[in-house]
From Swiss-Prot:
<dbReference type="GO" id="GO:0016887">
    <property type="term" value="F:ATP hydrolysis activity"/>
</dbReference>
<comment type="subunit">
    <text>Component of the SWR1 chromatin-remodeling complex.</text>
</comment>
<dbReference type="InterPro" id="IPR013272">
    <property type="entry name" value="Vps72/YL1_C"/>
</dbReference>
<feature type="modified residue" description="Phosphoserine">
    <location>
        <position position="65"/>
    </location>
</feature>
<comment type="function">
    <text>Participates in the catalytic exchange of histone H2A for the H2A variant pht1, an euchromatin-specific factor, leading to chromatin remodeling and changes in transcription of targeted genes.</text>
</comment>
<comment type="similarity">
    <text>Belongs to the VPS72/YL1 family.</text>
</comment>
<feature type="region of interest" description="Disordered">
    <location>
        <begin position="153"/>
        <end position="180"/>
    </location>
</feature>
<feature type="compositionally biased region" description="Polar residues">
    <location>
        <begin position="167"/>
        <end position="180"/>
    </location>
</feature>
<keyword id="KW-0175">Coiled coil</keyword>
<dbReference type="InterPro" id="IPR046757">
    <property type="entry name" value="YL1_N"/>
</dbReference>
<feature type="compositionally biased region" description="Acidic residues">
    <location>
        <begin position="40"/>
        <end position="56"/>
    </location>
</feature>
<feature type="region of interest" description="Disordered">
    <location>
        <begin position="1"/>
        <end position="81"/>
    </location>
</feature>
<dbReference type="GO" id="GO:0005634">
    <property type="term" value="C:nucleus"/>
</dbReference>
<feature type="coiled-coil region">
    <location>
        <begin position="20"/>
        <end position="95"/>
    </location>
</feature>
<feature type="modified residue" description="Phosphoserine">
    <location>
        <position position="64"/>
    </location>
</feature>
<feature type="region of interest" description="Disordered">
    <location>
        <begin position="93"/>
        <end position="127"/>
    </location>
</feature>
<feature type="compositionally biased region" description="Basic and acidic residues">
    <location>
        <begin position="20"/>
        <end position="31"/>
    </location>
</feature>
Length: 316
């Protein structure tokens, strides 16, 4: 049984707990009592019928002959057998009714809660002591085997006090159930520990990334020619700061090897009809045009109103 009590078993009992179940059990109890009353009524009617039948049998037996007496005996035997069977069925029904009534009485009674002393008792684990007998081991003359055996023996001897400490710590652990407030405090402590471990993990990850970046920059290979710029600040006596920059001289081969920069020349787009600078762009043919007449001619060519002359190299 667990030493920590569950939340359902530890909470206080509600005022309306079990009301519906109690109503159902009371209805079942009323139904069972009515059924028992009906069975007793049937028994009384059955006894009255038996008495009447016995009186009739006496009257008939006094008037009938011997043959009729034999027939009556056979009938009486059959009735006795039926009576025995009915009695057995009645006994079975009464047993079932008694069992149901006992179950209802048992369920109506409030359940007994286990005492905290019995719930807090936790079976203690039994530890078997391992005794090492050095005389029972096989010995070897090899140096490596002897050293390994000695190291194993020392580890076993060192593990004994640690094992005793763990056993005593588990024995001294507080017994009993935890309240809701204690569970909240334990959850808050666990959350704080998780946050601190997460911060440490993030810090270590950042340090690892910086270290990888520095190593990559340190071991990066550059192709010559290389021009290196170094800038730094120097504090002077009057408190001012100055920066020194290293600039490559004009005689440096890197300055002469670079080609001169050429600015791109902007060329005006001409109209395909007039040859003038184009202002518009036909959205269908995507051709530059300068005015409305050029636009109309481009659309007429597009609609195949003009035919192409391969000899003259134009539309006509």
């Amino acid at each position: 049984m667990s030493a920590t009590e569950s939340l359902v078993a530890g909470r206080t009992r509600r005022a309306n707990a079990g009301n519906k179940m109690r109503e159902l059990l009371e209805k079942e109890h009323l139904r069972m009592t009515q059924q028992n009353a009906e069975i007793e009524k049937e028994d009384e009617e059955y006894n009255i019928e038996e008495e009447e039948e016995a009186e009739r049998d006496i009257e008939i037996s006094s008037e009938s002959s011997d043959e009729e007496a034999e027939l009556k005996k056979l009938e009486e035997e059959g009735e006795e057998v039926e009576k025995i069977l009915r009695d057995e069925e009645r006994i079975k029904k009464r047993k079932i009714q008694k069992n149901r009534a006992a179950n209802l009485q048992r369920t109506l009674q409030p359940p007994k809660r286990p005492t905290p002393s019995a719930a807090s008792e936790v079976p203690k684990k039994k530890y078997k002591k391992i005794k090492v007998d050095p005389s029972a081991r096989r010995t070897s003359s090899r140096m490596h085997t002897v050293l390994m055996a000695q190291s194993t023996e020392t580890r076993l001897q060192e593990a004994k006090p640690r094992r005793k400490y763990t056993v005593s710590a588990s024995a001294n652990r507080q017994k009993g159930t935890m309240t809701q407030q204690q569970r909240f405090e334990e959850a808050a402590k666990t959350e704080a520990q998780n946050l601190s471990s997460l911060r440490n993990y993030v810090h270590l990850e950042e340090q690892r990334r910086l270290r990888l970046k520095r190593n990559a920059a340190k071991h990066r290979q550059l192709r010559e020619p290389i021009l290196k710029f170094i800038s730094k600040t120097i504090s002077t006596e009057d408190g001012r700061e100055a920066s020194n920059y290293y600039v490559a001289p004009l005689e440096h081969p890197l300055c002469h090897s670079a080609p001169p920069l050429q600015m791109p020349q902007h060329r005006a787009v001409e109209c395909v009809i007039t040859g003038k600078p184009a202002i518009y762009l036909d959205p269908v043919t995507q051709l530059p045009i300068s005015n409305v007449q050029a636009f109309q001619q481009v659309r007429e060519v597009y609609n195949q109103r003009y035919s192409w002359s391969a000899m003259l190299n134009l539309f006509h």
